[in-house]
Amino acid sequence: MAGWIQAQQLQGDALRQMQVLYGQHFPIEVRHYLAQWIESQPWDAIDLDNPQDRGQATQLLEGLVQELQKKAEHQVGEDGFLLKIKLGHYATQLQNTYDRCPMELVRCIRHILYNEQRLVREANNCSSPAGVLVDAMSQKHLQINQRFEELRLITQDTENELKKLQQTQEYFIIQYQESLRIQAQFAQLGQLNPQERMSRETALQQKQVSLETWLQREAQTLQQYRVELAEKHQKTLQLLRKQQTIILDDELIQWKRRQQLAGNGGPPEGSLDVLQSWCEKLAEIIWQNRQQIRRAEHLCQQLPIPGPVEEMLAEVNATITDIISALVTSTFIIEKQPPQVLKTQTKFAATVRLLVGGKLNVHMNPPQVKATIISEQQAKSLLKNENTRNECSGEILNNCCVMEYHQATGTLSAHFRNMSLKRIKRADRRGAESVTEEKFTVLFESQFSVGSNELVFQVKTLSLPVVVIVHGSQDHNATATVLWDNAFAEPGRVPFAVPDKVLWPQLCEALNMKFKAEVQSNRGLTKENLVFLAQKLFNISSNHLEDYNSMSVSWSQFNRENLPGWNYTFWQWFDGVMEVLKKHHKPHWNDGAILGFVNKQQAHDLLINKPDGTFLLRFSDSEIGGITIAWKFDSPDRNLWNLKPFTTRDFSIRSLADRLGDLNYLIYVFPDRPKDEVFAKYYTPVLAKAVDGYVKPQIKQVVPEFVNASTDAGASATYMDQAPSPVVCPQPHYNMYPPNPDPVLDQDGEFDLDESMDVARHVEELLRRPMDSLDARLSPPAGLFTSARSSLS
């Protein structure tokens, strides 16, 4: 209810804007009396594009109606009687309005709540001490609104001038008719006697001279009025062009740029409501001026007076038609982009919207929108107005949709919910270009009739570039193409040109944005992380980020050529890091438990002076998406150890926290945080003992060289430690792998956890053996439940 309390404190223009949000579609009284209930409902949890959420929307509608009915029943007394009737009427009205379209109720209330919050936020910013210095964005919006007020006043002025011209011309025509009547009277003078004729003729001549003098003077006045009106319209159109340029070429383009960066994980592009309100104001003022110009043309045709006005009016009429054409075609936009990595035979969605649909009555004859997929070359030809003969580069199913007008929000949009790319036709590739570097775009096109079919516009808009894949394995490289395009595309480019090289700081910004979005973390890439990445990319050892600021990164370096000495590209390695964090380690990254971006030598330097049992987690150089444990432990042979990397597959079997919990000689997370303090909350609870006569096996992470160390450390027993061992045959009988710790340690200091050592397979084989002939006194063969790397599926 706090939101409604704040909304009631709005004043002036903000209060008027809030009042406009309400009407028959949702009365303000309902908002007032059900404020607490409305603000406590999960309106944002419903996906308006998902038909499966209709049931939840219906429940909210029913709940709203029930709450209104209850509120009505509780009204007593004389004052409560009228309110009871009114609330009951609103309950019936809302039920009838939204019964068949409950999603529209959700859309309406979300629209109201969003704008209420925006108005309250803007009011608070202006009234707070910090709001005295209005930020640049608010200042710009203020200037736009001031220009609209100026345009409104000018348009009202030309309306008054037009009315004055019309009244003056009507009186002129009356007097002109009087002049014609006098001329007719001259023709009738011959029927009078000479004395009467002379007397009458003198009076008529005096009247005619006086009237003709007046007509000449008034004709000049009319011409002057017409010229002045045309000149005022010229000035109005100049201001309109300037305002439209600010809104369409600045604000709308900035929104589209934010939408593009949001594809890389940037902040959401924001609501279109403010932009739509500006575009609607533009449309309203443009249309008013167009009607004025046409009325002025009609007056000139009604009473032709030689002069420059006809040419002036023809010019302003052509200009205002160009202005309205630019407005309509530019405000046909893609509100929800199709996925930029588009897999064939997979359902996808998109939403297009016309920001001026309501004001220009386009919705009175709902237009149909068609979607087709075209190549980069076809997009270039389209923008050059070359004849593409309706060419396309593939077939999209369910690619036609009728635009719908939502009365509550005033939006005209088409929701493509079930499109699917059936097939794709690729162009011949250039040089080293792969299929995941080829860009397409979804073309949306329609035809709009404006002003009772006075004007008809063919409108088209292109989606952000999409990369088409046919298999999930292509997703990572396709994402690299999209990331580079979204990050470094320049305004007004030829489709879909991007720089082949960018500065390292530019790439850092794009990587950090993508990283935080993928990992869903506010903990982005630090200066040290970026230095590590620069060292990896440029194969340089400098530890100063500034040394890399002037260095350029080419697309080939980013994701075409392998890194020196490795069989993967820079992007593939970085993408693997994001994937393993996203799937398995988001909480650990957010806790700061994963240091990550350090190499083996850096890990050595960090751990060398730390107490035994101190460890850190870093991203592997040798395994894409791998995480390895480096730790300090003094022994006769060495004091620093590295475990062979774990990958996503390993963490799907046993979590990182549980693996660390198994290794009791790992005590401190670098630099000095107790391991259990960091990871204990993520340990899997110990299973209860079996009660059905069966023993449940459990995997335990063990490094053979440290079995004694683990025992000496006083490890708490796991379930497998506590459970009685199953009766097994002697090791030679089953050809089990003998304990052989020597190969586990590789020559450069990493444990090589043999992939062939699959404990799960042997456990399953063992449990399938007949047990009758086995000696119950025999214990499991050595090494059966211990291995440096174990898995149980």
Swiss-Prot record:
The modification Phosphoserine is found at residues 128, 779. The modification Phosphotyrosine is found at residues 90, 682, 694. InterPro entries: p53-like_TF_DNA-bd_sf, SH2, SH2_dom_sf, STAT, STAT5_CCD, STAT5a/5b_DBD, STAT_linker, STAT_N_sf. ISGylated. Residues 589-686 form the SH2 domain. GO terms for biological process: activated T cell proliferation; B cell differentiation; cell population proliferation; cell surface receptor signaling pathway via JAK-STAT; cellular response to cytokine stimulus; cellular response to granulocyte macrophage colony-stimulating factor stimulus; cytokine-mediated signaling pathway; development of secondary female sexual characteristics. GO terms for molecular function: DNA binding; DNA-binding transcription activator activity, RNA polymerase II-specific; DNA-binding transcription factor binding; phosphate ion binding; RNA polymerase II cis-regulatory region sequence-specific DNA binding; sequence-specific DNA binding. The keyword Transit peptide does not apply. The keyword GTP-binding does not apply. CDD domains: SH2_STAT5a, STAT5_CCD, STAT5_DBD. GO terms for cellular component: cytoplasm; cytosol; nucleoplasm; nucleus. Keywords: Activator, Cytoplasm, DNA-binding, Lactation, Nucleus, Phosphoprotein, SH2 domain, Transcription, Transcription regulation, Ubl conjugation. It is found in: Cytoplasm; Nucleus. Pfam families: SH2 (PF00017), STAT_alpha (PF01017), STAT_bind (PF02864), STAT_int (PF02865), STAT_linker (PF21354). In the virgin, found in most tissues except brain and muscle. During lactation, abundantly found in mammary tissue, as well as in other secretory organs such as salivary gland and seminal vesicle. Belongs to the transcription factor STAT family. Carries out a dual function: signal transduction and activation of transcription. Mediates cellular responses to the cytokine KITLG/SCF and other growth factors. May mediate cellular responses to activated FGFR1, FGFR2, FGFR3 and FGFR4. Binds to the GAS element and activates PRL-induced transcription. Regulates the expression of milk proteins during lactation. Forms a homodimer or a heterodimer with a related family member. Interacts with NCOA1 and SOCS7. Binds NR3C1. Interacts with ERBB4. Interacts with EBF4. Interacts with CD69. This is Signal transducer and activator of transcription 5A. It comes from Mus musculus. The gene is Stat5a.
